[in-house]
Every structure is written in structure tokens, then in C-alpha cells.
């Protein structure tokens, strides 16, 4: 994709299980579902926010751990228990008058393929299924749950020429 095309992206839709997490489902002794999120992805979220990209978490499961982590991450849109991601994305695009090329989608499995098709940019972790890898514009070298989202966002922002500016604001390191 060209820099011009990547600069159009205003929203990133991100799957949870297998993309932000390692796809494992863990339960505590009381039966509560737990998730392990990689703190490295936080830098990607914050960098995206610095350049005006809004984040939508779109997942088929509902989990209190996801709610808590996404609140900490100041995610603009948290959609859980979504059984029809395609219809949700289409409705969101219509309501907000968003064009396909203004949205990126990060996912890892078959249930993400149709959502990826609706968006102008698609990224996936290294351990995504082969069908998703074939659809992706960028395949991270990092596995889901181990910083793949940060890697994909850093790729996107580097290609747009905005990475250094974004992380400089995040970490106030003046580069």
C-alpha cells in the first residue's frame, strides 16, 4: 500500500482473541475468564491516538478482563459479544459516513476475513491462519498476544512518516 493510502486510515478495528491475546482462554478457580494482554501493545495504542487514529475493539466474546484493559487503554469503541462483525462494521461505516479506505482491520482467524475485506488495510500476527495471511497487507513477525498489534501499528505509522513523532509525544523523548 502507498503512504498516501495509509494516511487515510482514521480507525483501526482490532480483534481480541489471537490478536491482542495469545488466543488462550484461562479461568480462575471461580470460573471467571482471564486474558493475558501484552503491555507492548499499549505503546502502539497510544502512538495511534497521538496521530488521531481511533481504536475499535471488536470481539465475539465478552470478558471483564477485556473491558478493564480497554478502559485502561482509553479505547474509543469497545464492542464485545459481537456475533456478526460484518454487519456491525457496515453499520458503523454508514452511521459515521466512513469510507473503506479510512479503516484498518487487525485480526488472526477465519472470523476476521470478511471484516478485513470491508477495510482498506488489513494486518495480522505471525501466527494467523493462512487464509488471513493471504488477505493481509502486512503480516507481523510477532505472534498474537506478544506485541503483534504494536508491531502492526508501528509499521503503519512508520509508513505514514508519523512513528517518531507519535512516540516522541508518548514518551516525551524528543526524537
Language-model features: locations:
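Alpha-helical substrate-recognition element adjacent to the catalytic core
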Residues: 2-87
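Mg2+-dependent phosphoryl-transfer enzymes with acidic/Ser/Thr/Gly-rich catalytic loops
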Residues: 35, 71-73, 77-79, 86-175
